[in-house]
């Protein structure tokens, strides 16, 4: 059986005319994680890409506050994906 794998590189993509994707920094079971730069403020953020079906769970994340959970600061929908803009914490997971 032949399996086709499609890799989409989001480097250079700009979300909400504000967050510029710089590089992919991780891959998980449900999506990809990117490093982005806020073109307005100069801050760096983590951008978690999820399928649009996870929209409800993504929006609930903004309600969670705990020192061990990166804070969600923005949310973007684009096509069949949603993007969570979150605190970027350097290091390994």
Segments (PLM) and residue ranges:
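A short, low-complexity linker immediately N-terminal to eukaryotic Hanks-type protein kinase catalytic domains
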Residues: 3-21
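Protein kinase glycine-rich loop
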Residues: 22-28, 33
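Conserved N-lobe motifs of Hanks-type protein kinase catalytic domains
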Residues: 28, 64-67
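Conserved N-lobe loop of protein kinases adjacent to the ATP-binding glycine-rich P-loop
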Residues: 37-44
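Conserved beta3 VAIK motif of the Hanks protein kinase fold
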Residues: 47-48
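AlphaC helix of the eukaryotic protein kinase fold
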Residues: 51-63
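Activation-segment/catalytic-loop signature of the eukaryotic protein kinase fold
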Residues: 75
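Conserved short submotifs of the Hanks-type protein kinase catalytic core
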Residues: 79-93
